[in-house]
Amino acid sequence: MFTLSQTSRAWFIDRARQAREERLVQKERERAAVVIQAHVRSFLCRSRLQRDIRREIDDFFKADDPESTKRSALCIFKIARKLLFLFRIKEDNERFEKLCRSILSSMDAENEPKVWYVSLACSKDLTLLWIQQIKNILWYCCDFLKQLKPEILQDSRLITLYLTMLVTFTDTSTWKILRGKGESLRPAMNHICANIMGHLNQHGFYSVLQILLTRGLARPRPCLSKGTLTAAFSLALRPVIAAQFSDNLIRPFLIHIMSVPALVTHLSTVTPERLTVLESHDMLRKFIIFLRDQDRCRDVCESLEGCHTLCLMGNLLHLGSLSPRVLEEETDGFVSLLTQTLCYCRKYVSQKKSNLTHWHPVLGWFSQSVDYGLNESMHLITKQLQFLWGVPLIRIFFCDILSKKLLESQEPAHAQPASPQNVLPVKSLLKRAFQKSASVRNILRPVGGKRVDSAEVQKVCNICVLYQTSLTTLTQIRLQILTGLTYLDDLLPKLWAFICELGPHGGLKLFLECLNNDTEESKQLLAMLMLFCDCSRHLITILDDIEVYEEQISFKLEELVTISSFLNSFVFKMIWDGIVENAKGETLELFQSVHGWLMVLYERDCRRRFTPEDHWLRKDLKPSVLFQELDRDRKRAQLILQYIPHVIPHKNRVLLFRTMVTKEKEKLGLVETSSASPHVTHITIRRSRMLEDGYEQLRQLSQHAMKGVIRVKFVNDLGVDEAGIDQDGVFKEFLEEIIKRVFDPALNLFKTTSGDERLYPSPTSYIHENYLQLFEFVGKMLGKAVYEGIVVDVPFASFFLSQLLGHHHSVFYSSVDELPSLDSEFYKNLTSIKRYDGDITDLGLTLSYDEDVMGQLVCHELIPGGKTIPVTNENKISYIHLMAHFRMHTQIKNQTAALISGFRSIIKPEWIRMFSTPELQRLISGDNAEIDLEDLKKHTVYYGGFHGSHRVIIWLWDILASDFTPDERAMFLKFVTSCSRPPLLGFAYLKPPFSIRCVEVSDDQDTGDTLGSVLRGFFTIRKREPGGRLPTSSTCFNLLKLPNYSKKSVLREKLRYAISMNTGFELS
């Protein structure tokens, strides 16, 4: 009973709870329904009200209303309040447009104060409401301006409308209410306008104008009309002028308006009178004063992206070009702000491509994105930046240096005309280079005297820092900057004179001290040196030989001698003192700059001499010390060899080269030792098919085998092995014969240059089957000759040797400079085009080259479509370089690459990089000096009874010394060794050694030395008079076979005849 009662009670309570909850839910539902109904009714009511209001507004703006032009200002005010009350941009844009037109129409009414919309500002009851209303209307105009696209015709009309609204109500000059008696109201109205403008500025007015200007101007074809651009720029200026050029308003003006891409360019083209307003308010000076403060400049740059900082800089430079007087007075500030903006941009410049970089057409790889508008305007921005290195600005910046006079000697030196070999006569050149002209000495010698902390020096240093920063920041237009800086012929010589005057002693010591000082002053001085080197290097690179040696543009040859001496010492000290070893950043850039200028001068001197003997050597560097350091793997010694090997005497470098080869041979096991013999490769060559057999058997050999010992056995025309054992001699003959045949122009693998007949790959060598493999084989044979120290009489064209050394990969390499070594007449014709004063199009040239190839005229386009592009005064320099590059590189690119590949498979590139072009030729073909007979006599070996005191031998040396000319002595050497030039290191290094053997019989009967032949030769016993026989030779053994003549006159006659007829090219 009790349990049942408890159960019933629980059930009852639970049921009561459920009923209570249901009542609460129902009540909540009813309350929610009421709320929803209220919202729906409210929405419907609002919608109905909005619809009614919009209908009322639409009725108000009906176009066919005859009273529409004379609506009262109050009516417009009331309808505007209603529109603003429910305004939605997408839904009410047309109504807003009509409102604006109605307001502007009311402002144009004549003598009807009640119609003028602005008249409500004079009503005490409505003034505040009217001000608030016009603020809202104008800001909605700004909102529309941010969205409209100027390139669309309908949008451009709306832009004009909304700009007109902004122009009208931010300035009282067009308000008719202020005419006559209303003039007294102007101060109050001006105050209202200032209040309105302040409101707009607080809400981002300058951002709106920036968007509009950028959207309308930063495009392939600007689409802002003159009126629109004038209105927008006038609106931008108003707050600044009204605030009397307050810093608070100059800052946003610079950030938002002056950073619009190429704005000043567009203003000068479309509405130049706006620039007059800028000039009348001296705006450029105010900008300079604001930005020269480092903190403010940094703030502006950080507010802009790097790209827009560049736009700001371009606009300021353009303004500066229009206001030279301001720049003259504010040079220091202008230089400072330009340097700071460039430094800010440089922070985002990257050296290489990555996932985080974007390509910028001026800055290169850039760590910020580049928007479409900027890309479209980049050509205009670049033109603005060009003002920085334009002549007017350079004259203003460097006025202190350019105003100095360089004293000239009474008769300026003029170089002699170049010889056919394009070599300046050394005697006359050196005489001119060291004329004792006091005025020149004063210019060139590092006299010192100027305090480096003086205002004058600091100003020049700051300017040099600016231009050096521009070179490292604006990487893609670097050449343009260098060209602009070198345009004035006297700037660089005067800058060099200025550098020579710095410090207590001037010259080298000051700059070496700067390397060890990490002060701002030292960095600025080194930046000046870098700028001088970069510009001078660029200038000398683009000048041809006539301009350098004869016209002596910018630098006299005497100056180049002094500059090269300074650079040589500076680079050597940087390396030897250990500065380069760990160099990075600015120090590394300095070294690259100075070293680059040095090597341009050195290579030009190698091509055509202008320095005295031993000018490039360092007297304080002993080769023995350097070689000891190389053996110890000292870094500085390796760097000397890498960067400035020319400071070591040539003979020592050749010794070093031979040492390197020997060490490699030892490493590869190619040298015979007491415990092992090197592997020998045996080849059999048919004498009638020497080239073909040599090619087939050697081209398959491995690199190791090619460097090793190769033994040759010749087979004659009958198929019989020729007698004789090859102990390098037969291989030497084989190598010389192969090289002689492949370099024969008749084979058409190689051609000779006009004039001096030097060899280079034939452009038509492709007619040979497998011609590239042939060139690779030739490269291996040439490399093998150099590797073994076998000199071969193969004179190469200078430009081809440059390619063999890899000089053509240098950024400073100029094809035009090397062109005379290919075709001096063609070079003269091209340089005459450069100097042509008339209209070059009259010559009818195109960017193409017509060539007669085996009877057919072939047109080679220098660039794609070049045959349709005429050569003009603007592109003639490009034409000259393209033509030179085509003749010396493009035409023979594949052949050259194949030969270099073969050559480098034997000779490592780093081995020969320590030689200049002429030195490489000497390494290949021997010394071009006269034959040293005493050295030859000292290293001659005698056989067959001959000895140093034998009368025939005494006659021989006397004839060579007294009776033969230098040319005949060269012919004699070629007769015996097959090469007319002596070995580079002297005859001690001739392998096999120079030998003379007494012979009593003809070559076909000669069996070599026997006891009888030796005794007969020694005691001058003859079987018969050999007077009818000629001397012969075995070039493979460097052996002269000399009959035992009875008279000196007979020896002289026979020897002269033999060498002139070259009868001795035979095999023993």
Curated annotation (Swiss-Prot):
The modification Phosphoserine is found at residue 419. The modification N-acetylmethionine is found at residue 1. Coiled coil: none annotated. Keywords: Acetylation, Disease variant, Intellectual disability, Phosphoprotein, Synapse, Transferase, Ubl conjugation pathway. SUPFAM superfamilies: Hect, E3 ligase catalytic domain (SSF56204). GO terms for molecular function: ubiquitin protein ligase activity. It is found in: Postsynaptic density. InterPro entries: E3A/B/C-like, HECT_dom, Hect_E3_ubiquitin_ligase, IQ_motif_EF-hand-BS. It is linked to Kaufman oculocerebrofacial syndrome: A syndrome characterized by blepharophimosis, ptosis, mild upslanting of the palpebral fissures, epicanthus, ectodermal anomalies, developmental delay, and severe intellectual disability with absent speech. Proportionate growth retardation with a small head circumference/microcephaly, congenital malformations, muscular hypotonia, anomalies on brain imaging with hypoplasia of the corpus callosum, and low cholesterol levels are variably present. This is Ubiquitin-protein ligase E3B.
